Amino acid sequence: MLLRNGKILSYLNLTLTAAIWGFAFVAQRSGLESLDPFTFNALRFALGTLCVWLVRKVARPGDAPARTDCGTTFTRKGIRQLLLLGLLLFCASSLQQTGMLWTSAGSAGFITGLYVVFVPLISLLRGRKLSKALLVSIPLAVMGLWLLNKDVGLNANLGNGLVLLGAVFWALHIQLIDRLTQLHSSLDIAVVQYAVCTLLSALVAFPVSRAVPAWNMDLAELLQGIGQATVPILYAGVLSVGVAFTLQLHAQKKTAPEVASVILCLEGVFAMLGGYLILGEEVSLMAATGAVLLLAAMLATILGEGRGHFLIDKKGKPKF
């Protein structure tokens, strides 16, 4: 079994995405100290939209759809799907960011990573068959996530419930990306979904900030809050949105969503690593064991995908 260079690059892109997202949980939690969830998301996705739009202006022709028979124009159906992708991104990011008001970054990281379960469940509903490698790696990943976050103190509270619902939307988002990256360039998809998420976040931020006294700020207070959250906004906007989400889009052109979800849940490992390197947090033996299991799940998935057991229907054709 020999993996092609394109596959290897996709795996590296997904791993880098997981690393950026892992460190982003701390940034997102810090941003909530100064801004409400929707204003924070509106600002970071606006920044991400701007970054990707600028890159798109100078992008090389290599940023093309995975399929060569679909052209470059947007159909009405394609536009509706892109708008739906932006809506899913808005729902997922809003639920996650709002949930973090009542839960820790560690809890949010663990619960969000449960999309590794939801993605293959959705695939089964779509009529796909999971390979033996995935049947092994998914339980490994769940066990690894649990061990990695065993000490965070999960409770059945509102915050964890919102983040869990967000994980379902993240799974739907990953699944729809699987289809759209076959039909459109990753930069086109990125600009549209980020812009939609920015607009929806801004539209919700205004009435919500007026309804919640703690978030009701005048212009001077808002500018002060933005100033205090500058670093989290820059990290979450430029790196988490502009770089990581776009890398995910590019990588999923050649990677099945089930495989992508296993690799992306490595964000929990990088969150732990960031806490150790930056915040000086201790890493328990249990957490280290969880990290090893997550790495094992990723390797099992990658080796299994090399056998070509994904994205094939009963007639042997690609299934979208």
Each model region followed by its residue ranges:
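Specific alpha-helical transmembrane segments that line the substrate/conduction pathway
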Residues: 39-50, 97-128, 132, 166, ...
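C-terminal-most transmembrane helix of multi-pass membrane proteins
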Residues: 3, 45-46, 53-54, 58, ...
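Glycine-/small-residue-enriched transmembrane alpha-helix faces in small-molecule transporters
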Residues: 1-42, 87, 91, 95, ...
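Hydrophobic alpha-helical transmembrane segments of multi-pass integral membrane proteins
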Residues: 8-13, 39-54, 58, 134-140, ...
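Helix-helix packing/entry segments at the starts of transmembrane helices
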Residues: 18, 43, 108-114, 177-199, ...
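Loop-to-transmembrane-helix transition segments
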Residues: 9-17, 65-96, 158-166, 215-243, ...
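Hydrophobic transmembrane alpha-helices of multi-pass small-molecule transport proteins
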Residues: 52, 130-150, 167-170, 201, ...
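Specific transmembrane alpha-helical segments of multi-pass solute transporters/efflux pumps
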Residues: 24-25, 53-112, 147, 237-255
